[in-house]
């Protein structure tokens, strides 16, 4: 009963958003200086000492989010539950995206049951959640 109430609560508070993928976020060795949330007071290097994407908690469930305006955004390191066809993954926002979410292909494959390449871009629901959902 509690589980179904939690799922219904998530669904009722979620908003629709576009989700695509970029294989740059799949590169564990890519330096965090390549993303908007690199350094500065809100940067992931500054806050956690991570130097590359593979060190990020929850990797490869990372990506860009349109709510991150650019370098040192207060939205850096926020966690989102993204739901597609009843499947939810949690993604840590590490970069700016022009439209919705642009996440690692591996993360989108987890979200779409291996269909990221075939689908390319999807409409999903999302909600900001506690960072503990993203391994922080």
From Swiss-Prot:
Entry annotated with the keyword Disulfide bond: yes
Protein location: Secreted
KW Nucleotidyltransferase (keyword) present: no
Leader sequence segment: 1-16
Primary localisation category: secreted
Induction cue: Produced during infection of wheat leaves.
This protein's name: Protein SnodProt1
Species of the source: Phaeosphaeria nodorum (strain SN15 / ATCC MYA-4574 / FGSC 10173)
